């Protein structure tokens, strides 16, 4: 066994060889908080998720997969990314293979629907050809494909009900991703695939869940996010939204396996104020004493919901707290000082 110094030098040499051969980020220490330098990103609409992703959002020039059960918030999260990209002056496209895009809901999430490019393709091949053409143009900042499960191969659509088409969709995805990854990287476009969950038959041990479309997307995706609804949010007897957990199950641009929770409110999307409040309490930027929440010398509310509404009504205080969370070195400044 090598002594510690020699082992460290040998390890550094091995890591540099791996990075030289396979690119920066092929290997990293899990405890290392530093993400890869110079990675441009698009915010997700949730500050806690941006921090968990390690680069301030979803990375540009990469393939992203968002998967989860039905009604877990997959499309909501993707629409928030589109909204944030548009705020930065970017152009977004939505390949609606499910033919289920709700324009009114997208507008409520802040998407400029007049500027959004939408395609509703007839076949999986058509959807992926359109995606390739848009990405190759170099003008698109974010492209969402909703969803992989709805990318039905032409042969299956033209065939009869009951015909067997084993592995057709997996082959289609594999071929498309082989073509797409290079141009996605060169164009600096963020391509988000939304995916559904299926159950493997006959799995006795381990997780029986799997995603549709074969294994290609699992390999080609730089970031994979597992999104789940964990609780219903109620106001009296009315359901107003859901508590959502996102786990970053794969991340090639920063350490993976981070988990975050936030609220998705019906008709509003991700509750940004609630997300900032939870994160601020966790990082001691906002103090919680009993049911009261205080920021500096000011009490902002009794109970989480009242405090969230206070932040919604006072965007300048929300922006100040957000700045302290994004740049922790400013915590030394007096909290609440305007």
Curated annotation (Swiss-Prot):
Pfam families tied to this protein: RecA, RecA_C
InterPro entries: AAA+_ATPase (IPR003593), DNA_recomb/repair_RecA (IPR013765), DNA_recomb/repair_RecA_CS (IPR020584), P-loop_NTPase (IPR027417), RecA-like_C (IPR049261), RecA-like_N (IPR049428), RecA_ATP-bd (IPR020588), RecA_C_sf (IPR023400)
Single GO molecular function: ATP binding
GO biological process, one term: DNA repair
Compartments where found: Cytoplasm
Keyword ATP-binding: yes
A Gene Ontology term for the protein's cellular component: cytosol
Keyword annotations of the record: ATP-binding, Cytoplasm, DNA damage, DNA recombination, DNA repair, DNA-binding, Nucleotide-binding, SOS response
Residues engaged in binding ATP: 68-75
Predominant localisation class: cytoplasm
Function: Can catalyze the hydrolysis of ATP in the presence of single-stranded DNA, the ATP-dependent uptake of single-stranded DNA by duplex DNA, and the ATP-dependent hybridization of homologous single-stranded DNAs. It interacts with LexA causing its activation and leading to its autocatalytic cleavage.
Family statement drawn from the similarity comment of this UniProt entry: Belongs to the RecA family.
HAMAP family referenced in this protein's UniProt entry, alphabetically: RecA
PANTHER family linked to this entry: MITOCHONDRIAL DNA REPAIR PROTEIN RECA HOMOLOG-RELATED, RECA
The protein, known as: Protein RecA
Organism whose genome encodes this protein: Citrifermentans bemidjiense (strain ATCC BAA-1014 / DSM 16622 / JCM 12645 / Bem) (Geobacter bemidjiensis)
Upper taxonomic lineage: Bacteria, Pseudomonadati, Thermodesulfobacteriota, Desulfuromonadia, Geobacterales
């Amino acid at each position: 066994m090598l002594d510690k110094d020699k082992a460290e030098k040998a390890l550094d040499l091995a890591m540099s060889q791996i990075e030289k051969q396979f690119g920066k980020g092929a290997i990293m220490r899990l405890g290392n908080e530093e993400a890869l330098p110079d990675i441009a990103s698009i915010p997700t609409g949730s500050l806690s998720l941006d921090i968990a992703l390690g680069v301030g959002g979803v990375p540009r020039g990469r393939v992203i997969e968002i998967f989860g059960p039905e009604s877990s918030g997959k499309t909501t999260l993707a629409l928030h990314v589109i909204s944030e990209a548009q705020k930065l002056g970017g152009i977004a496209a939505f390949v609606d293979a499910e033919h289920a895009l709700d324009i009114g809901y997208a507008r409520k999430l802040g998407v400029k629907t007049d500027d959004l490019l939408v395609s509703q393709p007839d076949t999986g091949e058509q959807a992926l050809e359109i995606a390739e053409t848009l990405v190759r143009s170099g003008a698109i900042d974010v492209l969402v494909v909703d969803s992989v499960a709805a990318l039905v191969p032409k042969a299956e659509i033209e065939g009869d009900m009951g015909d067997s088409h084993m592995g057709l969709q997996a082959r289609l995805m594999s071929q498309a991703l082989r073509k797409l990854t290079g141009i996605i990287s060169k164009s600096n476009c963020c391509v988000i695939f939304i995916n559904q969950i299926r159950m493997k038959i006959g799995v006795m041990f381990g997780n029986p869940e799997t995603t549709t479309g074969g294994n290609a997307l699992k390999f080609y995706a730089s970031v994979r996010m597992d999104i789940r609804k964990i609780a219903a949010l109620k106001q009296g007897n009315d359901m107003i939204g859901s508590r959502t957990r996102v786990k970053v199950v794969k991340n090639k641009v920063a350490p993976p396996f981070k988990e975050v929770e936030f609220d998705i409110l019906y008709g509003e999307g991700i509750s940004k104020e609630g997300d900032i409040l939870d994160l601020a309490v966790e990082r001691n930027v906002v103090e919680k004493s009993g049911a009261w929440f205080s920021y500096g010398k000011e009490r902002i509310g009794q109970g989480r919901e009242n405090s969230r509404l206070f932040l919604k009504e006072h965007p300048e205080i929300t922006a100040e707290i957000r700045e302290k969370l994004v740049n922790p070195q400013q915590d030394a400044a007096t909290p609440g000082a305007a």
